[in-house]
């Protein structure tokens, strides 16, 4: 039977509960245990699919098409296990399920209430489908004390009594701030956070304390005394140079041993940390460095491109180089020539986005990469803009644009009005709902034999994750190919363009899907490995 670890956060948000959960899962895996990670988000949105990237950050898409929290990306990258739609739940989804059941009459006329109906639905989500796992780690979003998190805290409190003894523990992540005027770390915020948690009936078994400097033993003893946890269960979580340093750091602090001890488990074998030590060695001892420009729309918030940032780093690991990212707001190139900025970089990447803002600036960056033979990688929207740029500047198609931007006689990119979902043909219109209406999840693509991208993959049939509402218009394929743009990948039915490239360019590839979502530190995505390899070659020419 699975054992449950519930991870809560206190004092402030953005302490890194997702990284803490992923790191603990990696440590348990290194000891030979099977682990599942789940995220419970208290917001009322059904999913983050329609939320602004500036508010929520990246939307992480799973193989089965769920739009989920970006922490699931950390879970996948640290454990190598693919998440699915059942690994992330929101208050909105919980309430939607309950209302649907109430309308069907499933509650037999009962008054539907937060307790027991909402909490029962949360508990059902937490405990379903865990038979094959040794541990289930559940991260509770938000901060203790948030009113919207109360049903989740009540649900995990109840599970402590409903599951067998020693099958549930609580890890509380908190902050110990340093007050420079006093010259000391302060324990009081953590004490109050634990007090708030205890007020809802939850007593943490382990305190994971974030700090920017080592915590003195006297302060750890103080936390142990006032927060009612064992001295060894006060684990310091110091700031690390990279997130991939965290598992080793937590192991050295004894987090995994303390978790097993809390469950009454005393394994004889230490975890095998060899691959984590290899990764951190590569990160801190690169054999060179390159610089790439990411020309994007949401560059003001790096969390909007979290998986992309990590995938680029993985490409650097594969090539034993440090990759410096120069974040460029695409609107900059709508006001000025990109040459002075881009001539210094070794590669250009245009990531996914929605809407017309910054599109012209991105196309100027794409034109620069094409004409100057700089390695270029276009993802989703980046591929679509590469096709529009070719239509305008090579094929000389008048008013070439996207129907997402404006009405045009030559929509190189158009709205997907219908596609198969399972065996059902779904249709949507411009006035329909936006939530869950995109092409989402893993789909197959057929790559041309001997194309550059097929050589990179080492195969001609691939499965990649998609998240898009618009597609390159197949009606313009022949005209664009006559101008040298190769449609090197198509959907198996030959209807949807999936990849493009220029045969006479050192490295120019656009993909309709999101390869960054499947890249892992121990298994870098081949496209990112190849792209960074090309930038290394470019660095020798600049």
Curated annotation (Swiss-Prot):
Gene3D superfamilies: 3.40.50.880, P-loop containing nucleotide triphosphate hydrolases
UniProt keyword annotations, A-Z: ATP-binding, Glutamine amidotransferase, Ligase, Magnesium, Metal-binding, Nucleotide-binding, Pyrimidine biosynthesis
GO BP annotations listed: 'de novo' CTP biosynthetic process; pyrimidine nucleobase biosynthetic process
Residues annotated for ATP binding in this entry: 14-19, 71
Single GO term (MF): identical protein binding
One cellular component (GO) term of this entry: cytosol
Residues annotated to bind UTP: 13, 186-191, 222
Catalytic activity: UTP + L-glutamine + ATP + H2O = CTP + L-glutamate + ADP + phosphate + 2 H(+); L-glutamine + H2O = L-glutamate + NH4(+); UTP + NH4(+) + ATP = CTP + ADP + phosphate + 2 H(+)
Residues that coordinate or bind Mg(2+): 71, 139
Any Pfam family matching the protein: CTP_synth_N
Glutamine amidotransferase type-1 domain: residues covered: 291-541
The protein's Enzyme Commission number: 6.3.4.2
Pathway of action: Pyrimidine metabolism; CTP biosynthesis via de novo pathway; CTP from UDP: step 2/2
Active site: 380 (nucleophile), 514, 516
Residues annotated to bind CTP: 13, 146-148, 186-191, 222
Organism superkingdom: Bacteria
Binding partners and assembly: Homotetramer.
Function according to Swiss-Prot or TrEMBL: Catalyzes the ATP-dependent amination of UTP to CTP with either L-glutamine or ammonia as the source of nitrogen. Regulates intracellular CTP levels through interactions with the four ribonucleotide triphosphates.
Miscellaneous comment as given in the Swiss-Prot or TrEMBL entry: CTPSs have evolved a hybrid strategy for distinguishing between UTP and CTP. The overlapping regions of the product feedback inhibitory and substrate sites recognize a common feature in both compounds, the triphosphate moiety. To differentiate isosteric substrate and product pyrimidine rings, an additional pocket far from the expected kinase/ligase catalytic site, specifically recognizes the cytosine and ribose portions of the product inhibitor.
Family that this chain belongs to: Belongs to the CTP synthase family.
Protein name per Swiss-Prot or TrEMBL: CTP synthase
Organism: Bartonella henselae (strain ATCC 49882 / DSM 28221 / CCUG 30454 / Houston 1)
């Amino acid at each position: 039977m699975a054992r449950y670890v519930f991870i809560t956060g206190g004092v402030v948000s953005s302490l890194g509960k997702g990284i803490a959960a992923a790191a603990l899962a990696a440590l348990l895996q290194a000891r030979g245990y099977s682990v599942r990670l789940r995220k419970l988000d208290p917001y009322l949105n059904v999913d983050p699919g329609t939320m602004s990237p500036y508010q929520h950050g990246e939307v992480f898409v799973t193989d089965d098409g769920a739009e989920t929290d970006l922490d699931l990306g950390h879970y996948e990258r640290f454990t190598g296990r693919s998440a699915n739609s059942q690994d992330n739940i929101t208050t909105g989804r919980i309430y939607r399920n309950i209302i649907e059941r109430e309308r069907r009459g499933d509650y037999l006329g009962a008054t539907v209430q937060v307790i027991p109906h909402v909490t029962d639905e949360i508990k059902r989500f937490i405990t379903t489908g865990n038979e094959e796992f040794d541990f289930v780690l559940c991260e509770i979003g938000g901060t203790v004390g948030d009113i919207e998190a109360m049903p989740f805290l009540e649900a995990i409190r109840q599970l402590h009594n409903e599951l067998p003894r020693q099958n549930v523990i609580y890890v509380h992540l908190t902050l110990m701030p340093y007050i420079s005027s006093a010259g000391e770390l302060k324990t009081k915020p953590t004490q109050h956070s634990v007090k708030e948690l205890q007020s809802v009936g939850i007593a943490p078994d382990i305190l994971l304390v974030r700090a920017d400097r080592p915590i003195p033993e006297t302060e750890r003893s103080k936390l142990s005394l006032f927060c009612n946890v064992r001295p060894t269960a006060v684990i310091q979580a110091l700031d690390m140079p990279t997130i991939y340093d965290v598992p080793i750091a937590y192991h050295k602090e004894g987090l995994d041993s303390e978790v097993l001890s809390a469950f009454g488990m005393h394994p004889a074998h230490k975890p095998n940390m060899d691959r984590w030590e290899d990764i951190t060695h590569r990160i801190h001892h690169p054999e060179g460095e390159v610089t790439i420009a990411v020309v994007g729309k949401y560059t003001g918030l790096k969390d909007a491109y979290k998986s992309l940032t990590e995938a680029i780093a993985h490409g650097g690991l594969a090539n034993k180089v440090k990759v410096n990212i120069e974040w460029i707001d695409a609107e900059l190139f709508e006001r000025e020539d990109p040459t002075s900025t881009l001539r210094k970089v070794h590669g250009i990447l245009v990531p996914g986005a929605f809407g017309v803002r910054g599109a012209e600036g991105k196309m100027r960056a794409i034109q620069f990469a094409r004409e100057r033979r700089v390695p270029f990688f276009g993802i989703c929207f980046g591929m679509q803009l590469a096709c529009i740029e070719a239509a305008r500047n090579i094929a000389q198609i008048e008013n070439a644009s996207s129907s997402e931007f404006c009405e045009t006689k030559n929509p190189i990119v158009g709205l997907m009005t219908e596609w198969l979902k399972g065996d059902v043909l779904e249709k949507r219109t411009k006035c329909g709902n936006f939530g869950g209406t995109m092409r989402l999840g893993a789909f197959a693509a057929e790559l041309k034999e001997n194309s550059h991208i097929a050589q990179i993959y080492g195969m001609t049939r691939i499965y990649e994750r998609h998240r898009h509402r618009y597609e390159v218009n197949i009606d313009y394929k022949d005209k664009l190919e006559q101008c040298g743009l190769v449609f090197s990948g198509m959907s198996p039915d030959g209807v949807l363009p999936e990849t493009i490239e220029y045969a006479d360019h050192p490295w120019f590839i656009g993909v309709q899907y999101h390869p960054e979502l499947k890249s892992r530190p121990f298994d870098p995505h081949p496209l990112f490995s190849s792209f960074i390899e090309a930038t290394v070659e470019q660095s020798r020419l600049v």
